[in-house]
Amino acid sequence: MDTTAVASKGSTNVGSSTDTLSTSASLHPSMNAGSVNEYSEQQRHGTNSFNGKPSVHDSVGSDASVSNGHNNHNESSLWTSGIPKALEEATKSKKPDSLVSTSTSGCASAHSVGYQNIDNLIPSPLPESASRSSSQSSHQRHSRDGRGELGSEHGERRSAMDGLRDRHIRKVRVSQLLDLQRRRIRPADHTTKDRYGIQDFNFLQTLGTGSFGRVHLVQSNHNRLYYAIKVLEKKKIVDMKQIEHTCDERYILSRVQHPFITILWGTFQDAKNLFMVMDFAEGGELFSLLRKCHRFPEKVAKFYAAEVILALDYLHHNQIVYRDLKPENLLLDRFGHLKIVDFGFAKRVSTSNCCTLCGTPDYLAPEIISLKPYNKAADWWSLGILIFEMLAGYPPFYSENPMKLYENILEGKVNYPSYFSPASIDLLSHLLQRDITCRYGNLKDGSMDIIMHPWFRDISWDKILTRKIEVPYVPPIQAGMGDSSQFDAYADVATDYGTSEDPEFTSIFKDF
Amino acid sequence: MSFEEVYEELKALVDEQNPSDVLQFCYDFFGEKLKAERSVFRRGDTITESFSDGDESDFLSELNDMVAGPEAIGPDAKYVPELGGLKEMNVSYPQNYNLLRRQSVSTESMNPSAFALETKRTFPPKDPEDLKRLKRSVAGNFLFKNLDEEHYNEVLNAMTEKRIGEAGVAVIVQGAVGDYFYIVEQGEFDVYKRPELNITPEEVLSSGYGNYITTISPGEYFGELALMYNAPRAASVVSKTPNNVIYALDRTSFRRIVFENAYRQRMLYESLLEEVPILSSLDKYQRQKIADALQTVVYQAGSIVIRQGDIGNQFYLIEDGEAEVVKNGKGVVVTLTKGDYFGELALIHETVRNATVQAKTRLKLATFDKPTFNRLLGNAIDLMRNQPRARMGMDNEYGDQSLHRSPPSTKA
C-alpha cells in the first residue's frame, strides 16, 4: 500500500521530468526560427555575395552530410576521406521533416541545418523506454528506502536522488550535443584559392596589426557588405620561418565551421602578400571590453568561457590545437557572441605532439616552457588563464621580466583575489594544473569535466551553442555599416597591395 | 523590513562611503537588497530548481542581476554608459602590469620526425673540467633542468667559444634579434638599458647604451630568453675588460638537441608500450596518453626499486641500465635490461610484489601508477582485466605476478 502510493508519486515525477525535456523540445522550433533569422545574415553573405560564385552550396551539402552521418564517428577520418560516402548515406538516412527548414530557404545556412538535427535529437538523449525505466526503478528503490520515514526527510532524499539523475540526464544531453557539433566540418577539397581577388574589395582602415601584416576592414565591391581581410607579407613569413604555420592557418580555417570560430571566405595573393577574407566581427576585441570593464562579474566571464569551451572542444575533437588563446584573439560579433580569430598557431596533431614554442607569454602552459612535447592539454591551461584574467582583470602569472614570468608559471602558485567564488577557484585549480595527468580537459572524460563543473551549473549548453541566450553585452555599433568604432585606431601606412611585378614565393604558398 | 530600516541602512552607507554618483549608488543598493531577499525566497523550493537545466529565465534574471549585483555595489564599481549592461569594476592591478595588447611569440616550426631521419649532428667534446664549470653556471636555470646527464653534455658541447679581445665591445645590443645565449668564462661585462620601448639597435648604437644596470662576472650567463624564442634583446651587454672568453649557444641547436632527444624517447616509449601484453587492448591514442604521462626516474646502482612483499601500484619500463630480480631464498632469478618492464599487473590488481628489483647499474626507468592510469583512461582497466593475456601474465615463467620480460625483439 505504502509502496504503491510512493511509486505512483514517483511516476508522476517521471512525468514531470519528461515534461522538462519536452518543454525544452517544444522550445526548439522557435529556437530554429531564431537561429535561421540570425544566420540569415550569413546566408546572404553566402548566397548573394560575390555574385554567381556558389560559395556556400558545397559546404552546406557536405555539412548536412557530416552532421547527419552517424557512422562518421572516427574523428581522424574527417580529415582524410569518406565525405562523399557520408553524403550518400546521409541522404538515405535523412528524415524528411528535418529537411523542412532547409528547403524553405532554398539554400539554408549551414548552421540551421546542423542545429535542426541537434534539435531533433535532444529531446531523447536516452532511448525513451530506457530513460523511463531507469528513473522509475530509482524511484522504486526510493520508496523502499523511504518507507516509514518522515515526509520532509523523505522529500530531501528524493530530491537528492533526482538531482543525481538530473545531472546524469544533463550529462547525456550535453555529450550528445557535443557529439553533433564536433562532426561539422567542411570537406577537404573545399577550396579557398582564387575565389576572390584584390579587385573585389575596397580596402578601408586597419583593424589590427601583427608581426607579419595587418587586418583591414574591407567592403565588397559586389554586395557592398563588410569583411575583414588579413594581409600577410610573404617575405616576413619566410624570414621568420613561419611558412608551415601560415599554410596550416589557411588549411584549418578552410575546414572548420563553428558558430564561435571566424569564417574564412577565401584567400588570394599578389606578388608580395597573402590575403585571407574573413568575417568582420564588429564588436571589437574582448580584450578591449575587458580592459574597459577592468574585470567581469562571474556571470559574464562564465558566458564567454562557455563559448570558448565549445569552440576548443570542437577543435580538439577534430585534432586541432589552437595554441594562442587570449582575449586579444576573441572578437565580438554584432550580437555580442564570440568569434575566435587568428589561427596562426593552430596545428593538426592527429599523431604527433607539438614541440614548437608558440603562444603568448602570459598564456603559455608549463609543459611548453619546460621544453616538453605538448598537446591539447596546453589549450585547457590557457583557458584557465583566460578565465582568471576575465575574473581578475589581470592574468595569474605576471612579471615584467619574461624569464621571471616563466619561472612563476613553472612554480604554479596562484593567488586568487578574495572576490573569486569557491566554484571558480575549484575549476581554475583544475585547469591551472601543472601535472597534465591531473588537468581537466585532458582526463578520461575530456572536456566534460569542465562543462559539467559546478561553476557552469547555470549554463544551458545547448542554448549557448545555438546562441539562444541573452548576451551580457551588446556592442554599441551600427550593424552592417562598416562601423569600426569598437576597434582601436591604427596609423594607416602606404600599402603595395595588388602589385604583380616580381611575384615572390608563389610555389611555397600555392594554396593561397 | 520596514521602509525606515531600509532608509536608515542606506543613509548610513551613503554617509560612510560618500559616493560620487548618489543615484547609481542607491540603485545598486536596492538592487542588492532585492536580490538578497529573492534568493531567500527562492531557496524555499529547491526541488524545482534542481530540475531546471539552467533555465533561461533564471539565467536572464541573473544576467540582469549583474547590473546591480553584489559585486557592483558602492565603491567597487563605476557606471560607464558605453558599457551597456556592464560596469567598470575596481581592480588592483599588479605593480607595473602592462595593460597593452600582448604579442604572440614563436620559435621556428620544427618537425622532429623529419630530423630523426637525418644524421645526428655531433659536436667535439669539451674538456670535462670545462663541462663541469658550464654545468654549474646553468644549474639554476629551468631551461636546463629537464635535461638528463647525456643530453646536458650534448647541449654544452654544442656551445662555441668566442674570444673578445677588447673592452667596450657590444655582445648584444638592445632591440636586436636574439639568437644566442651566452655564458661568461673569463672577463666582465656591463649591462645597459634604454628606457624606451621598441627601440631599434641602430638608435642604441648611435645614441648610447643607456643606463647602467649591472655587471656580469665569470660563471654567469645572459641572453637566455633567446633559447626560447626570438624576442628583441631587452638590454645591451658590453665587455668591460680586455681578453674575454664567452661560450655561445644558438636557439636552433639547443632546441634541436632537446626535441630530437625528446622525440627519440617518445618513440621508444611508444614502441615499448606496444610490447606490453597487458596494454594491448588499448588503442594508439590511449597508449599515447600513457606515453605522455610517463615519468623518468633514475636509481643508482644497488638501490632497490620494488621490494618483495610490498604492495605497489607502479609500473616500470627500463629505459637504460640493468636491474636484477631477486626472490627471497632463491637469489637473483633474472637480469632485466633496456626494453624490459616490470610491475605492470599493479595497474589492474592490488598486487603484492613477488620479487625484489634492484638496480645493477645506474638504472633509468619510465614509470606511471594506477591512479594516473585511472584518471587518464578510466574504465580501460576493465577491458584489460577481462583479457586472457592479462591472466596469462600471472603465470609467467617466473611464477611471478609482477614481473615480465618483453620479447627479445624489443631489445635494441
UniProtKB/Swiss-Prot annotation, chain A:
One of its GO terms (biological process) is positive regulation of protein export from nucleus. The active site is at 324 (proton acceptor). This is cAMP-dependent protein kinase catalytic subunit. Keywords: ATP-binding, cAMP, Kinase, Nucleotide-binding, Phosphoprotein, Serine/threonine-protein kinase, Transferase. InterPro entries: AGC-kinase_C, Kinase-like_dom_sf, Prot_kinase_dom, Protein_kinase_ATP_BS, Ser/Thr_kinase_AS. Belongs to the protein kinase superfamily. AGC Ser/Thr protein kinase family. cAMP subfamily. The lineage of its organism: Eukaryota, Fungi, Dikarya, Ascomycota, Taphrinomycotina. GO terms for molecular function: ATP binding; cAMP-dependent protein kinase activity; protein serine kinase activity; protein serine/threonine kinase activity.
UniProtKB/Swiss-Prot annotation, chain B:
One of its GO terms (biological process) is negative regulation of adenylate cyclase-activating glucose-activated G protein-coupled receptor signaling pathway. The keyword RNA-binding does not apply. InterPro entries: cAMP-dep_PK_reg_su-like, cAMP_dep_PK_reg_su, cAMP_dep_PK_reg_su_I/II_a/b, cNMP-bd_CS, cNMP-bd_dom, cNMP-bd_dom_sf, RmlC-like_jellyroll. Residues 392-412 are annotated as: Disordered. Keywords: cAMP, cAMP-binding, Nucleotide-binding, Phosphoprotein, Repeat. 3',5'-cyclic AMP 1 binds at residues 143-277. 3',5'-cyclic AMP 2 binds at residues 278-412. One of its GO terms (cellular component) is cytoplasm. Tetramer, composed of 2 regulatory (R) and 2 catalytic (C) subunits. In the presence of cAMP it dissociates into 2 active monomeric C subunits and an R dimer. This is cAMP-dependent protein kinase regulatory subunit. It comes from Schizosaccharomyces pombe (strain 972 / ATCC 24843) (Fission yeast).
